[in-house]
Every structure is written in C-alpha cells, then in structure tokens.
Swiss-Prot record:
Belongs to the scoloptoxin-17 family. The lineage of its organism: Eukaryota, Metazoa, Ecdysozoa, Arthropoda, Myriapoda. It comes from Ethmostigmus rubripes (Giant centipede). Coiled coil: none annotated. InterPro entries: PBP_GOBP_sf. This is U-scoloptoxin(17)-Er1a. Residues 1-18 form the signal peptide. Contains 4 disulfide bonds. One of its GO terms (cellular component) is extracellular region. It comes from the Eukaryota. It is found in: Secreted.
Length: 130
C-alpha cells in the first residue's frame, strides 16, 4: 500500500514539474492546428519579417480568428486554444476578455495586451509559427 501511495505521489510530482516550466499552452499542438492555414499564405517562403507577419495574419483570417479588418474574434480564438491549454485556463480567458471586452477588437493591440497580461503567469509560452 505504501509503495502504491509513493508511486502515485511521484506521478503527481512529475506532472506538476512538467507543467511548472512556465508554459500554459501546448504550442506544438496549437501550431499544428493553425500551421496549415498559415503555410497556405506563404509563411515558409516569406523573405522578410513583414511578409511572415502578413502570412500569419492571412492564416488567422482563413481560420476565422482574425477578420478582414484585422480584428481578433475572441471566441473563435478561445475555441482554438481550448484543447491546447495546459494550465491557467481561467487567467488566459480572463486576459482575453479584459483586453477585448466587446469580443471583436483590433488584433495587434489585443494580442499585445494579452501577452503583457499573461507574461508573468505563462513566461514559457511563445506564439510564433515554425
């Protein structure tokens, strides 16, 4: 019995340590969901940072996360994030809601605000396509 309890304790510790690296989002999983649309927009062949940025915007538009007016659709973004969040889901969603209370806001400003709010909670997360 003691051995079983110890084994369970070790598993809990390992899971805690695995998520204690500052990461809140399983970025490989999220990017795997988004990458095809971003690649269709020419990300891999983009010669400049601006061209890469434009390809990401185009991909997010294809997915319905960003409108043609370059506004973030918060609920659609949450839907994409949902099964990729490892920890702090409430904090992540609250940050999105605080940065865009209307549900549709300028994407660049909203993402900047969002990342500033979650940086201390999720310092290990970086959102950049491969």
């Amino acid at each position: 019995m003691k051995l079983l309890v110890f084994a369970l304790f070790l598993q809990v510790v390992q899971l805690s340590l695995a998520q204690d690296d500052g990461k809140c989002i399983d970025m490989p999983k999220l990017l795997k969901k988004m990458q095809p649309a971003i690649d269709e927009c020419g990300y891999k062949d983009a010669p400049t940072d601006q061209a890469k940025h434009d390809a990401v915007t185009c991909g997010l538009q294809k997915l319905g996360i960003v409108t043609q007016n370059k506004e973030l659709v918060v609920q659609t973004y949450k839907d994409y994030l949902d099964d990729t969040i490892l920890q702090h889901k409430t904090e992540l969603y609250n940050a999105l809601d605080e940065c865009c209370p209307s549900g549709t806001c300028p994407a660049q400003d909203t993402f900047k605000c969002y990342h500033e709010k979650i940086d201390s909670v999720c310092p290990g997360d970086k959102q950049k396509p491969q």
